[in-house]
Swiss-Prot record:
Its cofactor is FAD. The keyword Nucleotide-binding does not apply. Coiled coil: none annotated. It comes from Caenorhabditis briggsae. Its main location: mitochondrion. Its EC number is 1.1.99.2. This is L-2-hydroxyglutarate dehydrogenase, mitochondrial. GO terms for cellular component: mitochondrion. GO terms for molecular function: 2-hydroxyglutarate dehydrogenase activity. Gene3D superfamilies: D-Amino Acid Oxidase, subunit A, domain 2 (3.30.9.10), FAD/NAD(P)-binding domain (3.50.50.60). Belongs to the L2HGDH family. It is found in: Mitochondrion.
Amino acid sequence: MLTRKTFHAFRSISGPPKKSVELPKYDLVIVGGGIVGCATARQLLIEKPNLKIALVEKEKELAVHQSGHNSGVIHAGIYYTPGSLKAKLCVEGLDLSYEFFDKEKIPYKKTGKLIVAVEQEEVPRLDALFARAQTNGCRDIEMIDSKRITDIEPHCKGLKALWSPHTGIVDWGYVTKKFGEDFEKRGGKIYTSYPLEKIEDNLKDSNYPIRVSSDPSYADFETKNLITCAGLQSDRVAALSGCSTDPKIVPFRGEYLLLKPEKRHLVKTNIYPVPDPRFPFLGVHFTPRMNGDIWLGPNAVLAYKREGYSYFSISPSDLLESLSYSGMQKLVKKHFTFGIKELYRGIWIAAQVKQLQRFIPELKYSDVTRGPSGVRAQAMDSAGNLVDDFVFDSGTGKLSSLIMHVRNAPSPAATSSLAIAKMITSEAITRFKL
């Protein structure tokens, strides 16, 4: 599990309210204390400061899962389909993020990023990626030759590369907590250790038509409107208000290696492969971290638990749910060889090092150790397709006009979080008549 920086200034979060406590009634409750939930809560109070808003989170603190278990990259928006929400919100979110970091004095580094073609057959795909980046409005992207590659990254070898100077790194878990701090400073209230169990019609007060409940020993929340940003649990939370189970969240664990401290000089910037469209993930890469570490990887394997960060973290019910899903079975059939190779690279470090040596030939097996892991909430449809864009839903029934669910917010959701928050806030103000 990753080590996260403790944000000592943030002390005002409340634990779960006991049944005996009479809670205030809220204009809006937000479920999920990750980066999208916290950014959205903050943005709503920026635009509508008189609203009474609560944010509930099932863990003891904010940013425990995806928001605190990620590569820390600030993405430029290169990869994403032109016209998609991913492309639009990432490019917008990049600038909003740097503006926020500067204003709040949050440490970050503009390390840049190389996407490197090491074989001739990869060059046409790199050219297509360059065209896509330009269509998406990514700033200052360059196509560079092998000499420029070594000028930027002396130990990296390649034929051609895309150079993205505005790609950077930051501690997204810390950023999430800053969003939460700002939300509370503006009058919002955060309740942790509150796992959501029910979303119901509130029969007690028609002015607050939604009842949100947890453990029977905890108080219920009564609210006019509800937004859920539940990450790895997003499909299950959406189902509580009658939404379809599709797309389903299938958890994929990514396992990193660490470059030993005496070898950190080998890597200065983010180094990525040219993505292969035949496969569903980007491939192994080199990622500098704010603390000076260099992460190598990750692979991508099915997690045995929704929030399972190791091979020994297993939930039989979660695993059965993933394996019995028709979409997962179709994905396995389509990418069986790829999946076996990913599993093999996770078990045998030398296999992953061999992939990394394509970019830095002098890297050795003895230069690396096992590192941290994260779990990605990947939405998948019943046909076995990985859902590639953000998905929002409301479900059906009496309460559907009062509820918004964020069903899929994969990478680059952290980079895009402030732009996503603006979009959700605009939609909420219109739909909920706030």
